[in-house]
């Protein structure tokens, strides 16, 4: 029997919605990255974008474990000499675009390159509880029920 290889025309993409309230960032990002790549399917093929479309709501209510909320630092460079910039996770979550923390975590778990960029376009992250994708009839995925460590206990 020959090895199965998914053809791009045969791909069936589902829509999944995840409520990120109270979930641990890294664990949630790992599950989202797996869904975006399609590794949860038996038909996974490394060179084909056969992952699902993922909608994440309440991304501003994700949590970190330990002291990462105040100590984790995100760096970027402007391109100018001496242009290194930094922000803590707390500054980003309390700032204008709190969903970027989760977007960056997922982006860094998806392979870099043309396929990874295409798969990242299937991710939609919203800071609040509202999203404009009701017409797609997304299926809810309860990440908290998958493992008790996915939710931070006080």
UniProtKB/Swiss-Prot annotation:
One Gene Ontology term, aspect cellular component: cytosolic large ribosomal subunit
GO biological process, one term: translation
Gene3D superfamilies named among the record's database cross-references: Ribosomal protein L13
Signal peptide per UniProt: none
Entry keyword set: Ribonucleoprotein, Ribosomal protein
MF-aspect GO terms: mRNA binding; structural constituent of ribosome
SUPFAM superfamilies in alphabetical order: Ribosomal protein L13 (SSF52161)
Entry keyword annotation includes Ribosomal protein: yes
Superkingdom as given in the UniProt entry: Bacteria
Alphabetized Pfam families for the sequence: Ribosomal_L13
Protein family (similarity comment): Belongs to the universal ribosomal protein uL13 family.
Annotated function: This protein is one of the early assembly proteins of the 50S ribosomal subunit, although it is not seen to bind rRNA by itself. It is important during the early stages of 50S assembly.
Assembly and interaction partners: Part of the 50S ribosomal subunit.
Name by which UniProt lists this protein: Large ribosomal subunit protein uL13
Source species: Rhizobium etli (strain ATCC 51251 / DSM 11541 / JCM 21823 / NBRC 15573 / CFN 42)
């Amino acid at each position: 029997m020959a090895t199965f290889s998914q053809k791009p025309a045969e791909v069936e993409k589902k829509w999944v919605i995840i409520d990120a309230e109270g979930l641990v960032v890294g664990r949630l990002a790992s599950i989202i990255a797996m869904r975006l790549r399609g590794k949860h399917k038996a038909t996974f093929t490394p060179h084909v974008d056969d992952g699902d479309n993922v909608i994440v709501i309440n991304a501003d209510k994700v949590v970190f474990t330990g002291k990462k909320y105040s100590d984790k630092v995100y760096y970027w460079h402007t391109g100018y000499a001496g242009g290194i910039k930094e922000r803590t996770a707390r500054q980003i979550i309390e700032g204008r675009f709190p969903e970027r923390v989760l977007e960056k975590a997922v982006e860094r778990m998806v392979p870099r390159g043309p396929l990874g960029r295409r798969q990242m376009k299937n991710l939609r992250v919203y800071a609040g509880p509202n999203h404009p994708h009701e017409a797609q009839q997304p299926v809810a995925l309860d990440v908290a029920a998958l493992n008790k460590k996915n939710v931070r206990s006080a």
